[in-house]
Amino acid sequence: MSAVAPEGRPLLRLEARNAQTPIERKPPWIRTRMRTGPEYSDVKGLVRAAGLHTVCEEAGCPNIYECWEDREATFLIGGDVCTRRCDFCQIDSGRPTPLDRDEPRRVAESVRTMGLRYATVTGVARDDLADGGSWLYGETVRQIHALSAGTGVEVLIPDFGGRADQLDEVFGAAPEVLAHNLETVPRIFKRIRPAFRYERSLDVLRQARAAGLVTKSNLILGLGETAEEIHAAMRDLHAAGCELLTVTQYLRPTPRHHPVERWVRPEEFLDWERVGAELGFSGVMSGPLVRSSYRAGRLYQQAITARGEGHTAASDLPKSVLETSHTQ
């Protein structure tokens, strides 16, 4: 696989340097088996019939069979070009298209058509917009709730530069879960996420928790971090009020992206899940093929249970989603 720059810009020096390392061969445990059931088949049929688009299919997520069987899906908003560049992310950076103000309605209609019990909404950073795209995130949550009152909504947001007014726009839409991903540890943070700041990301989670929202984040392993640094980042997240955590293996999208520093074995991921529980997270999912939206409805219910609350929004979630245990 050759290193080709996104259309409209030259290859960055960092990308050229990354490309000197060939794409790594995946270990045998980085694979998944196709397991389909009636719910998955029904959702797939609805998606095909209505011509809908989900991140699950378009990103080739290995967990699509499990998530769709639970009637969970993820949607990308704001376009497919980001104003920032993270060295692990497959979404290209550049000049985004104009804001599509009808997108929230279309996403909400897709959620209703698919009969989803839980929807995750993520998107690109839109630093080109005066409000950072905060209205788009908030309005998408509002539209989904309006059309599908029984559907839980998780929104995975950028940091909006830490601006309280932009964060409040999203918080005020009352998503069931407010997710903001820390992704990596302080020592390599600037290299991996140059447009973000470690402490600012923690502060987003603090503000979300102060607003009463269920909070969630993600850590990616295999970028060059040490075990001590992972543990410290987990402690920082918990201290910031983060309730739910996913821990994932870095999979390199293209030669332009950061090389995989190591493949983390499944048993180490189980160790990190135990560490997270000991630190006091309400729910942790940790595994080579776990992604931040994996079994999101189940994790949400673990947070609700830990808070001692009754189930609030997605009242028709099935027993499989309400279980606080899970299998990898």
UniProtKB/Swiss-Prot annotation:
Its EC number is 2.8.1.8. It is an enzyme of class 2 (transferase). [4Fe-4S] cluster 1 binds at C56, C61, C67, S293. The gene is lipA. InterPro entries: Aldolase_TIM, Elp3/MiaA/NifB-like_rSAM, LIAS_N, Lipoyl_synth, rSAM. The keyword Cell membrane does not apply. [4Fe-4S] cluster 2 binds at C82, C86, C89. Its cofactor is [4Fe-4S] cluster. HAMAP family: Lipoyl_synth. CDD domains: Radical_SAM. It is found in: Cytoplasm. It comes from Frankia alni (strain DSM 45986 / CECT 9034 / ACN14a). This is Lipoyl synthase. The keyword Membrane does not apply. Keywords: 4Fe-4S, Cytoplasm, Iron, Iron-sulfur, Metal-binding, S-adenosyl-L-methionine, Transferase. Pfam families: LIAS_N, Radical_SAM. One of its GO terms (molecular function) is lipoate synthase activity. It comes from the Bacteria. Pathway: Protein modification; protein lipoylation via endogenous pathway; protein N(6)-(lipoyl)lysine from octanoyl-[acyl-carrier-protein]: step 2/2. Residues 68-282 form the Radical SAM core domain. Binds 2 [4Fe-4S] clusters per subunit. One cluster is coordinated with 3 cysteines and an exchangeable S-adenosyl-L-methionine. It catalyses: [[Fe-S] cluster scaffold protein carrying a second [4Fe-4S](2+) cluster] + N(6)-octanoyl-L-lysyl-[protein] + 2 oxidized [2Fe-2S]-[ferredoxin] + 2 S-adenosyl-L-methionine + 4 H(+) = [[Fe-S] cluster scaffold protein] + N(6)-[(R)-dihydrolipoyl]-L-lysyl-[protein] + 4 Fe(3+) + 2 hydrogen sulfide + 2 5'-deoxyadenosine + 2 L-methionine + 2 reduced [2Fe-2S]-[ferredoxin]. One of its GO terms (cellular component) is cytoplasm. Coiled coil: none annotated. The lineage of its organism: Bacteria, Bacillati, Actinomycetota, Actinomycetes, Frankiales. Its main location: cytoplasm. Belongs to the radical SAM superfamily. Lipoyl synthase family.
